[in-house]
Amino acid sequence: MKIIFFLCSFLFFIINTQCVTHESYQELVKKLEALEDAVLTGYSLFQKEKMVLNEGTSGTAVTTSTPGSKGSVASGGSGGSVASGGSVASGGSGNSRRTNPSDNSSDSDAKSYADLKHRVRNYLLTIKELKYPQLFDLTNHMLTLCDNIHGFKYLIDGYEEINELLYKLNFYFDLLRAKLNDVCANDYCQIPFNLKIRANELDVLKKLVFGYRKPLDNIKDNVGKMEDYIKKK
């Protein structure tokens, strides 16, 4: 009788463990798909296209071009672009504001404040629906900037908040992707092709995922880079 009871308990434990693993797997995949869509949409909205704001009666336009040269394939790092099966990336966190250089865009490409505001606000509201507490303050701040044309110009001219948002979204994508690969490490579940971590990404992702837990190491690394930069100058 005791043996039967033990076997039933053991069987229940195995089934329950598999159910928990399955629920964790489904939840992770759902979150990752939402994050992937958010980063790709943000990349298309803010970096792939050029934003030209028509200021109305003045006839002038403010052009925002693709920031930097980060539009290449990334390997899971914090600052890249859309990677095949890897990090879906954004620009860097960008602590200083930048003035985007004007290019060949003409005034005919300019869109009204109402049109651009609608697109940006819809995107930011989608980000809020992801319910990441760490993004609430930033998205609320960006939504406030969208409330008037001067704040909106500040937002799309400087790109500081935009870069920070895309950087954080990409960071969470990499973090959860590493967690998913860990959950499925013992073949409990099958990892979707676009969420797999490949060998050439592993080292970069280790630094990214574990690096945020070691702020002192990150600070030392940043100081070292700054010292090298000063020496070159």
Curated annotation (Swiss-Prot):
It is found in: Cell membrane; Secreted. The keyword Signal applies. The gene is MSP1. The p190 precursor is cleaved by SUB1 prior to merozoite egress into 4 subunits p83, p30, p38, and p42 which remain non-covalently associated. SUB1-mediated proteolytic cleavage occurs in an orderly manner; the first cleavage occurs at the p83/p30 site, followed by cleavage at the p30/p38 site, the last cleavage occurs at the p38/p42 site. The order of cleavage is essential for parasite viability. SUB1-mediated processing is essential for merozoite egress. Its main location: membrane. Residues 74-94 have a biased composition (Gly residues). GO terms for cellular component: extracellular region; plasma membrane; side of membrane. It is a lipid-anchor; GPI-anchor. Residues 58-67, 95-107 have a biased composition (Polar residues). Forms a complex composed of subunits p83, p30, p38, and p42 which remain non-covalently associated; the complex is formed at the merozoite surface prior to egress from host erythrocytes. Forms a complex composed of processed MSP1 subunits, MSP6 subunit p36 and MSP7; the complex is formed at the merozoite surface prior to egress from host erythrocytes. Within the complex, interacts (via subunit p38) with MSP6 subunit p36 and (via subunits p83, p30 and p38) with MSP7 (via subunit p22). Forms a complex composed of MSP1, MSP6, DBLMSP1 and DBLMSP2. It comes from Plasmodium falciparum (isolate CDC / Honduras). Residues 58-110 are annotated as: Disordered. This is Merozoite surface protein 1. The keyword Calcium does not apply.
